[in-house]
Amino acid sequence: MKIHSCLSAILLFLFFSASSAKQNVRTERISGSAGDVLEDDPVGKLKVYVYELPSKYNKKLLQKDPRCLTHMFAAEIFMHRFLLSSPVRTRNPDEADWFYTPIYPTCDLTPTGLPLPFKSPRMMRSSIQLISSNWPYWNRTEGADHFFVVPHDFGACFHYQEEKAIERGILPLLQRATLVQTFGQRNHVCLDEGSITIPPFAPPQKMQAHFIPPDIPRSIFVYFRGLFYDVNNDPEGGYYARGARAAVWENFKNNPLFDISTDHPTTYYEDMQRAIFCLCPLGWAPWSPRLVEAVVFGCIPVIIADDIVLPFADAIPWEEIGVFVAEKDVPELDTILTSIPTEVILRKQRLLANPSMKRAMLFPQPAQPGDAFHQILNGLARKLPHDKSIYLKTGEKALNWTAGPVADLKPW
């Protein structure tokens, strides 16, 4: 590390240890249109019809494995629950702006809690066959006024490895639908232009239980807990996280300003609240729950994921609250972070302290105005009114029901 960078970091470190408690209690409203969008109330701007499906598509999966409720893909479950009691729900499909199919394609977990996406395409096809056979609404647009929550690693490509996900592409039957997904990366086959990118699920009540007094100084400069190498799937570290996590470890494992480890302590949430910067590098996918945790706990997210599309980017000013570091620049991470002026850091912290910012990243029970549920509805409302071109002529078809891998065509 350069001497200048080291001295700058130490000065920052000491400054924040002494003064961050006083500064962090201040908040700053998001300026301009972004702040207005974040605080929009979607009620009255759209009506959603929720299809009633057999429980094998949703509730029975959850009964079989309740772990799905706490998994980072749980948005598919909580969005269903939210819509059932939301004032935007209509029981008259003829007046609906949007149609929602409540299925839980990621609620199929291994004994270690990892999702198995391999049955998801068949489940999705089965549900679409069901709604297209029993209601007329799918057939009139072939899904263009329907939305699906697909929170898996690579969304509706339904594979956890990027190479395989790219090979598969988005499920053909979803080509016209709006996808609500955690995956977001520019110019990627698994992100449709009209998709709504959302945060992964992080348990609000669990995080709430770990809040510490706001006057505790932020005495950690850079914080990260997680894998640097996926020893089972990529022991050399060149493919996992495109080598970015391995580069963090190799360059900064002995740097006293970097509190990084594979250990996951019981004080993880408390530690994030004591840190100035929290690393949010890509893993197998560009996103992770660390992004949510950093925002909720007021730790400036350091986003290391080239071309990432972040949640609710039209409402949350990510450039103002976070720090973006190119994957190739990871070896310069210490210099980059220690070069950020103090006043810039303080402003980012004030923005992060805004309650509306935190609410937008969470799926609380019960729902709250401005939370992630409402941001999704805002995204759907901004797509209205639908263009007349989405409606097909009698007998017209746009989708190929026989396209896709042979395994996907088997009954579910």
UniProtKB/Swiss-Prot annotation:
<dbReference type="GO" id="GO:0080116">
    <property type="term" value="F:glucuronoxylan glucuronosyltransferase activity"/>
</dbReference>
<comment type="similarity">
    <text>Belongs to the glycosyltransferase 47 family.</text>
</comment>
<keyword id="KW-0808">Transferase</keyword>
<feature type="glycosylation site" description="N-linked (GlcNAc...) asparagine">
    <location>
        <position position="400"/>
    </location>
</feature>
<feature type="transmembrane region" description="Helical; Signal-anchor for type II membrane protein">
    <location>
        <begin position="1"/>
        <end position="21"/>
    </location>
</feature>
<keyword id="KW-0472">Membrane</keyword>
<keyword id="KW-0735">Signal-anchor</keyword>
<dbReference type="InterPro" id="IPR004263">
    <property type="entry name" value="Exostosin"/>
</dbReference>
<dbReference type="InterPro" id="IPR040911">
    <property type="entry name" value="Exostosin_GT47"/>
</dbReference>
<keyword id="KW-0812">Transmembrane</keyword>
<dbReference type="GO" id="GO:0009834">
    <property type="term" value="P:plant-type secondary cell wall biogenesis"/>
</dbReference>
<dbReference type="GO" id="GO:0071555">
    <property type="term" value="P:cell wall organization"/>
</dbReference>
<dbReference type="GO" id="GO:0000139">
    <property type="term" value="C:Golgi membrane"/>
</dbReference>
<keyword id="KW-0328">Glycosyltransferase</keyword>
<protein>
    <recommendedName>
        <fullName>Probable beta-1,4-xylosyltransferase IRX10</fullName>
        <ecNumber>2.4.2.-</ecNumber>
    </recommendedName>
</protein>
<keyword id="KW-0333">Golgi apparatus</keyword>
<dbReference type="GO" id="GO:0010417">
    <property type="term" value="P:glucuronoxylan biosynthetic process"/>
</dbReference>
<dbReference type="GO" id="GO:0006486">
    <property type="term" value="P:protein glycosylation"/>
</dbReference>
<feature type="topological domain" description="Lumenal">
    <location>
        <begin position="22"/>
        <end position="412"/>
    </location>
</feature>
<keyword id="KW-1133">Transmembrane helix</keyword>
<dbReference type="GO" id="GO:0047517">
    <property type="term" value="F:1,4-beta-D-xylan synthase activity"/>
</dbReference>
<keyword id="KW-0961">Cell wall biogenesis/degradation</keyword>
<comment type="function">
    <text>Involved in the synthesis of the hemicellulose glucuronoxylan, a major component of secondary cell walls. Probably involved in the elongation of glucuronoxylan xylosyl backbone, especially in the formation of GlcUA side chain of xylans.</text>
</comment>
<feature type="glycosylation site" description="N-linked (GlcNAc...) asparagine">
    <location>
        <position position="139"/>
    </location>
</feature>
<dbReference type="Pfam" id="PF03016">
    <property type="entry name" value="Exostosin_GT47"/>
</dbReference>
<keyword id="KW-0325">Glycoprotein</keyword>
